[in-house]
């Protein structure tokens, strides 16, 4: 995953939009060598994902319009909420997220891109 993130970072700003707190996300990033440009989400927006303010505050943090941003997630409901606000969307499969065959293998909503993992998404996006 870190190699795919490094590829994506060559062309795009990267920031998780998390319902977790910032200190948790920093610990996760340090432990796994995730080189985020920022950490966004619930603490910044003072609300939780799938509320519009979470996605809009994340776009605003980079001084971008929603149409200039892409939400990448393994959860179709997060992608659906982001798409309603004009963000582009990419689904990455995590079929074993909570154990064997417990996660999404494919999106259940319309998305701009669907990939089996972040490396495949980087390939699709040309980085």
Q: What do these predicted ranges mean?
A:
Residues 11-12, 86:
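Glycine-centered short loops/turns at secondary-structure junctions
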Residues 1-11:
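Catalytic-core regions built around general acid/base machinery
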Residues 6, 17, 22, 26-127:
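Asp-based, Mg2+/Mn2+-dependent phosphohydrolase catalytic module
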């Amino acid at each position: 995953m870190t190699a795919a993130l490094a590829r994506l970072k060559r062309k795009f700003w990267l920031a998780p939009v998390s319902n977790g707190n910032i200190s948790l996300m920093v610990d996760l990033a340090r432990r796994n060598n995730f080189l985020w440009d920022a950490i966004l989400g619930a603490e910044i927006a003072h609300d939780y994902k799938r509320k519009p303010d979470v996605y809009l505050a994340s776009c605003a943090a980079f001084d971008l319009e929603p149409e200039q941003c892409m939400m990448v997630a393994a959860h179709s409901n997060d992608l659906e909420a982001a798409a309603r606000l004009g963000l582009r969307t990419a689904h990455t499969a995590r079929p074993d997220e909570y154990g064997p065959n417990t996660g999404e293998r494919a999106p259940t909503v319309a998305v701009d891109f669907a990939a089996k993992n972040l490396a495949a998404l980087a390939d699709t996006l040309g980085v």
